[in-house]
Amino acid sequence: MGPPGPALPATMNNSSSETRGHPHSASSPSERVFPMPLPRKAPLNIPGTPVLEDFPQNDDEKERLQRRRSRVFDLQFSTDSPRLLASPSSRSIDISATIPKFTNTQITEHYSTCIKLSTENKITTKNAFGLHLIDFMSEILKQKDTEPTNFKVAAGTLDASTKIYAVRVDAVHADVYRVLGGLGKDAPSLEEVEGHVADGSATEMGTTKKAVKPKKKHLHRTIEQNINNLNVSEADRKCEIDPMFQKTAASFDECSTAGVFLSTLHCQDYRSELLFPSDVQTLSTGEPLELPELGCVEMTDLKAPLQQCAEDRQICPSLAGFQFTQWDSETHNESVSALVDKFKKNDQVFDINAEVDESDCGDFPDGSLGDDFDANDEPDHTAVGDHEEFRSWKEPCQVQSCQEEMISLGDGDIRTMCPLLSMKPGEYSYFSPRTMSMWAGPDHWRFRPRRKQDAPSQSENKKKSTKKDFEIDFEDDIDFDVYFRKTKAATILTKSTLENQNWRATTLPTDFNYNVDTLVQLHLKPGTRLLKMAQGHRVETEHYEEIEDYDYNNPNDTSNFCPGLQAADSDDEDLDDLFVGPVGNSDLSPYPCHPPKTAQQNGDTPEAQGLDITTYGESNLVAEPQKVNKIEIHYAKTAKKMDMKKLKQSMWSLLTALSGKEADAEANHREAGKEAALAEVADEKMLSGLTKDLQRSLPPVMAQNLSIPLAFACLLHLANEKNLKLEGTEDLSDVLVRQGD
């Protein structure tokens, strides 16, 4: 084998010659190989060992230029357009030959590609350096098939070139700042270097685990721009003021004790801390406070005053007359029976256990009506009697048989409820006329809207507009097109109108042909009715529609209840006087459901006759109570006015035993600002004596308006101003006033 030196240049020569043999026009951009500067071939006679002079010199400037151009070609090959042309120049030539040499066809195709990308706004940093429209601008404008002054082509070319240049500038700007950012980074620490080395070794071993990037710690340094957020306002520096306290303090009146806080404030827990209403917690969510340990309190000093106060007090006033040793059961029973008799004599007493009076129908057998199924089902008209003059008054409340006249006082049964139903309802009826009107037929099943009685009807307020008659003057020229033109008004019914006209709006509820008379008939004995109305009075029942709401403000009610005939004050008086008619005959009966009987027929005296409480008729109402005489109660109708300043001066003059002139002189000295020796209380004085002396020293009007609370409030003000000491007496009946220390 020969030396390897001569064989290497031969191989390189052959490869280079083969590379040069391919024309540039036949190669595509993706397959194009750019020739690199090769070292000069060594002579064949030189031995295999190379000599330093045979190697080319290192050109740094040329290498920098090649690196810059390599980026351009990389961007060129990475573009999306497959037919995008790249510069065919070689990097081995000098700088003057960097402009690519394209044919006219390639220039035209390159121009159309640039205009298309510019129109679609797809020029980015990736393909901006591969578009050579700026380099071939002059050749494009000077082509033979176009005119030299084609401004449309020039404008489009200039617009696309501007966009390409702008994107190139942005790309260079971004690269520069990226390089500057890399220069500003600190040197990696030893831990990061070890981490990179470990990651590199892991990658070499075939692992695909990515290195965990360390989290960057962002240091936020915020400087407040608004100075008002740093400064505290004057309102926040002040103590929080309670609005309830402001309102209470503003309404404080020196002339009365209503504004004293001690009488209005409350305590919340055992600490007896006075709290304003705004500070009181209605529902406390915290744990309740534990009570402190109760210690012993020394009460030896209070023993004597408490014993003195307890001597004059009664332990139980209700048992003050009770004696343990001298108590007698007979005397006690007599007092109790006298008290019970006193209550029994009252007219308003009601005894639910009272015995019912015997019925006038003596021939009727005993027993309840519900158990007698064999009784006659037809109405019995013989029980009414021959007194026809009472028939017109008794028929509305008359029952069909004597057994039904006595209605039991059962709770919630039909026999208790039916007598309350009146077919001629009035203002004292149990049910309202409007509710009873629902049984008048299908037309009245719906409740009617309530009519306004006071307000005048709307039909009266609206004036009737006179409609002008339509006349046609045959002698006048009338434009019939105006009357027969097509208007904008709809000629068909709308959808909403058709929906409203449904069967509910045009059809009455189903009529079940319910007979109202069955409501007052018994189920097992239809012939017996609980209520029956005379045929002559059936027409009069229609007057309920005219009944208006009861006016409770009428003069009869507002002036001492309802005036009328007074009931007898005593149970022994005759009740027949209440039923005497205008002619002297008995026109009404205390028994509205029974025929009247004389005292001789009944066997009882007139005093024994009374109202039957078990008969509930419409006219048998409760008698009105005894009318109370109108008694005028005298009370203070005007507010008391008191000059507190003058009252304090008078009280202070009495405490210091000064005359009137001396008190006025002291007041003048105080107003002038002169310093004078403060007067002191001469001797101990009592509040009761001060009040009596004030009534004599004050003017008549002020003396009349003076009261104990006002005098005590004035004394409290003086005690605060003059340093007085107030002490209570042992029996707490008076206040002792003396000069403080």
From Swiss-Prot:
Compositional bias per record (Acidic residues), positions renumbered to this chain: 361-377
Keyword annotations from UniProtKB, A to Z: Acetylation, Cell cycle, Cell division, Chromosome, Cytoplasm, Disease variant, DNA condensation, Isopeptide bond, Mitosis, Nucleus, Phosphoprotein, Primary microcephaly, Ubl conjugation
Keyword Cell cycle applies: yes
GO annotation, cellular component aspect: condensed nuclear chromosome; condensin complex; cytosol; intracellular membrane-bounded organelle; membrane; nucleoplasm
InterPro entries: Condensin_barren_su2
A Pfam entry, by short name: Cnd2
Gene Ontology MF terms in the entry: chromatin binding
Subcellular location: Nucleus; Cytoplasm; Chromosome
Annotated disease: Microcephaly 23, primary, autosomal recessive: A form of microcephaly, a disease defined as a head circumference more than 3 standard deviations below the age, sex and ethnically matched mean. Brain weight is markedly reduced and the cerebral cortex is disproportionately small.
Protein name stated in the entry: Condensin complex subunit 2
Organism this protein belongs to: Homo sapiens (Human)
